[in-house]
Amino acid sequence: MSIETLKERLPDYAKDLKLNLSSLANDITLSPQQLAGTFVASAIASRNADVTRAIVAEYESVLSPQALTAAKAAAAIMGLNNIYYRFVHMVEGDYAHMPARLRMNVIGRPGVEKLDFELWSLAVSAINGCGMCVESHEKVVREGGLSAEQVQTAVRVAATVHAVAATLDGAAALGDHPAAG
């Protein structure tokens, strides 16, 4: 599987997603590792097995084994953090002052440049809808030297990958298939 396979599987009403997927796959705003890791972490966070397999197949040759593991780890740890910190942010009370008491060691030692891991964490946090985490990771990557355009590119990747995953899930449930070319 590949990004081309995903595009072929999208129904005709998702033409914009096909175009966005193509343009983002060829985007040069981010480094190859940053782009590939953002795609991989976003695919995992989008919870669609076919999308995850296709995107990992597309980008595993771009990433070192350590970087591939780090992208997976960003999706995993943000799956935990985004829920916990979204709760802390949404309710009033003592929770913000209480220790989380959850292991998050990978954040301190991700196995890749911290800036790349933070960017991938930002993309996953955008998918998972944790405003507190988005703000925190955005601040770190901007202070680390990434431009607003680079941050926007990562979030565009996250949004597009998530939309592709949701559309393919919906199309499968409804029996929507692309028109025969």
UniProtKB/Swiss-Prot annotation:
Disulfide bonds join C130-C133. GO terms for molecular function: alkyl hydroperoxide reductase activity; disulfide oxidoreductase activity; hydroperoxide reductase activity; peroxiredoxin activity. InterPro entries: AhpD (IPR004674), AhpD-like (IPR029032), AhpD_core (IPR004675), CMD-like (IPR003779). Keywords: Antioxidant, Disulfide bond, Oxidoreductase, Peroxidase, Redox-active center. The active site is at C130, C133. It catalyses: N(6)-[(R)-dihydrolipoyl]-L-lysyl-[lipoyl-carrier protein] + a hydroperoxide = N(6)-[(R)-lipoyl]-L-lysyl-[lipoyl-carrier protein] + an alcohol + H2O. GO terms for biological process: cell redox homeostasis; response to oxidative stress. It holds the Pfam family CMD. It comes from the Bacteria. Gene3D superfamilies: AhpD-like (1.20.1290.10). Its EC number is 1.11.1.28. PANTHER family: ALKYL HYDROPEROXIDE REDUCTASE AHPD. Belongs to the AhpD family. Antioxidant protein with alkyl hydroperoxidase activity. Required for the reduction of the AhpC active site cysteine residues and for the regeneration of the AhpC enzyme activity. This is Alkyl hydroperoxide reductase AhpD.
